């Protein structure tokens, strides 16, 4: 039996923690978790899942504004998590995505990534999303892991200043 509240640093209260998560923390979590999620999705996908992912990639290519890019990206990554057929995985991904709606994420994004979207999202990121769909559709879990990792590392490199990647909370392991 535990007496008292858990240490603040370990709190997972869904209403407060996303607001406390920095862009570096969020990207690090995504780089660690999402490749494994993509691998699992490749083993559990069905034709309806693949059709949904193709539609989401097409929607991303048509995104014209920042908000549309963010919505398309979030929908794509959350769809992959749902493909695992695990409510725990899908819920974790939805929770991570919710951090992107908070002020800290928006400020970090504004400082470092704004110049790239939506043009980069329509091209490079959508091409990466398409590659992820192809390998998931093929049922190649290892290739799905690699494609997702490459995609997220590319985002992190564009999103975070190089100095932030090498500091605590940055994405480098």
Where are these regions (language model features)?
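Short coil/turn segments at secondary-structure junctions
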Residues: 17-21, 60, 64, 116, ...
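Charged, glycine/proline-rich intrinsically disordered loops and linkers
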Residues: 108-120
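Residues at secondary-structure transition points
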Residues: 17-24, 28, 67, 71, ...
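Short linear motifs at protein or domain termini
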Residues: 1-39, 43, 164-173
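Hydrophobic aliphatic residue packing
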Residues: 1-3, 13, 80, 132-136, ...
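Residue-level recognition of short, well-ordered coil/turn positions
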Residues: 65, 140-141
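C-terminal-biased regions
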Residues: 118-134, 141-173
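Conserved amphipathic alpha-helical segments that form helical-bundle/coiled-coil interaction surfaces
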Residues: 26-110, 128-131, 146-155, 162
């Amino acid at each position: 039996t535990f007496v008292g509240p858990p240490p603040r640093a370990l709190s997972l209260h869904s209403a407060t923690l996303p607001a406390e998560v920095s862009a570096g923390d969020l990207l690090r979590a995504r780089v660690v978790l999402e490749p494994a999620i993509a691998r699992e999705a490749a083993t559990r996908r069905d034709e309806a899942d693949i059709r949904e992912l193709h539609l989401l990639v097409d929607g991303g290519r048509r995104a014209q504004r920042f908000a549309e890019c963010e919505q398309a990206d979030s929908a794509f990554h959350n769809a992959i998590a749902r493909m695992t057929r695990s409510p725990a995985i899908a819920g974790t991904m939805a929770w991570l995505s919710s951090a992107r709606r908070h002020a800290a994420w928006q400020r970090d994004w504004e400082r470092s990534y704004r110049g790239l979207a939506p043009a980069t999202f329509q091209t490079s990121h959508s091409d990466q999303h398409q590659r992820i769909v192809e390998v998931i559709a093929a049922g190649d879990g290892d290739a799905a892991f690699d494609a997702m990792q490459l995609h997220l590392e590319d985002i992190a490199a564009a999103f975070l200043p190089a100095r932030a990647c090498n500091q605590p909370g940055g994405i480098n392991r």
